[in-house]
């Protein structure tokens, strides 16, 4: 039973548990500040293999993450649509969205980013959702017997996030410019696969991150155009009632999405 009352105490418990699990001979020096404790916890959680955890660990982790996540929640009903009443562009932290599903830009190993404290969306979503997501993703890969293909989509629970579900998709990685037609089509396929999966699960709304524009190096302007065009076409052709949020983090992406919708309205 989870009896630790402060998130600092919970962090210390989780850090100690992961350190013992590693059979590491290094002496563990526990930081004094909450911020430093969080960074140490996050780094250990990021590199931890997809191995089972104890019920006690899960109870402590869930109590901490759910408490931290509920302190910063953005409700879809507070967002203003950019087109009609079902398409939104919103700048902020996608892990704060109270919504049916958020989209995670995954890699083909499909286990979440395993680089300690890396600031990619894959890392942040897995960190804030909890270890269960990595375990679920590992089971998906085990069952299909291969890495995840580009342009496909899989769904897991959101666990400790405000979002009910996470839809994971692997975008194309750009190694040379200009972007090939194949990679343009693969990016569009990512959006289509996520939309279809959301409708198959009778979800009401989904929020997309900017797929492939980070370390996968897809040019932001092209990616925004493809995202907007693909989503609008899907909603029109299928008569889907999905509400779709384009989540952006940078000012540049915000401007690019606004420009894409302005061109669409001309």
From Swiss-Prot:
Question: Per its UniProt record, what Gene3D superfamilies does this chain match?
Answer: Leucine Aminopeptidase, subunit E, domain 1
Presence of the UniProt keyword Cell inner membrane in the record: no
Domain of life, per UniProt, equals Bacteria
Q: Which cofactor does it need?
A: Zn(2+)
Q: Is Hydrolase found in the keyword set?
A: yes
A Pfam family for this UniProt protein? Macro
Membrane-spanning residues where?
Answer: none
Which SUPFAM superfamilies does the UniProt entry name for this protein? Macro domain-like
Q: Which residues form a coiled coil?
A: none
- Where does the chain bind Zn(2+)? 113, 118, 120
Q: Which InterPro entries match?
A: Macro_dom, Macro_dom-like
Where does this protein hold ADP-D-ribose? 93-94, 107, 120-122, 212-214, 216
> Start and end of every Macro domain?
74-265
Report the EC code(s) recorded for this entry. Answer: 3.2.1.-
Keywords recorded for this protein, A-Z: Glycosidase, Hydrolase, Metal-binding, Zinc
Annotated cofactor note: Binds 1 Zn(2+) ion per subunit.
Q: Recorded GO terms, molecular function? A: hydrolase activity, acting on glycosyl bonds
Q: Which reaction does it catalyse?
A: 4-O-(ADP-D-ribosyl)-L-aspartyl-[protein] + H2O = L-aspartyl-[protein] + ADP-D-ribose + H(+)
Its annotated function is as follows:
ADP-ribosylhydrolase that specifically reverses the SirTM-mediated mono-ADP-ribosylation at an asparatate residue of GcvH-L, by releasing ADP-ribose from the target protein. May play a role in the regulation of the response to host-induced oxidative stress.
Family assignment from sequence similarity: Belongs to the MacroD-type family. Zn-Macro subfamily.
Name of this protein: Protein-ADP-ribose hydrolase
């Amino acid at each position: 039973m989870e009896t630790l009352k402060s998130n600092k105490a919970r962090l210390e418990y989780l850090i100690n548990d992961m350190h013992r699990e590693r059979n590491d001979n290094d002496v563990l020096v526990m930081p004094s500040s909450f911020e430093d404790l969080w960074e140490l916890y996050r780094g250990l959680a990021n590199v931890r293999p997809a191995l089972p955890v104890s019920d006690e660990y899960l109870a402590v982790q869930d109590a901490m993450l759910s408490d931290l996540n509920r302190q910063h929640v953005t409700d879809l009903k507070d967002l203003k649509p950019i087109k009609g009443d079902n398409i939104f562009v919103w700048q902020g932290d996608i892990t704060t969205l109270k919504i049916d599903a958020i989209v995670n830009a995954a890699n083909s190993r499909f286990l979440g980013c395993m680089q300690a404290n890396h600031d990619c969306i894959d890392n942040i979503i897995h960190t804030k959702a909890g270890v269960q997501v990595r375990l679920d993703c590992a089971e998906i890969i085990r069952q299909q017997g291969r890495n995840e293909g580009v342009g496909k989509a899989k769904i897991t629970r959101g666990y400790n996030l405000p979002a009910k579900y996470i839809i994971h998709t692997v975008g194309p990685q750009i190694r040379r410019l200009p972007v090939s037609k194949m990679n343009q089509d693969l990016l569009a396929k990512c959006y289509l696969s996520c939309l279809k999966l959301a409708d198959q699960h009778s979800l009401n709304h989904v929020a997309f991150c900017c797929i492939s524009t980070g370390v996968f190096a897809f040019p932001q302007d092209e990616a925004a155009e493809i995202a907007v065009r693909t989503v609008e076409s899907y909603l029109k052709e299928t008569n889907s009632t999905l509400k779709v949020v384009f989540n952006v983090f940078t000012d540049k992406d915000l401007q690019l999405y606004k420009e894409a919708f302005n061109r669409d309205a001309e």
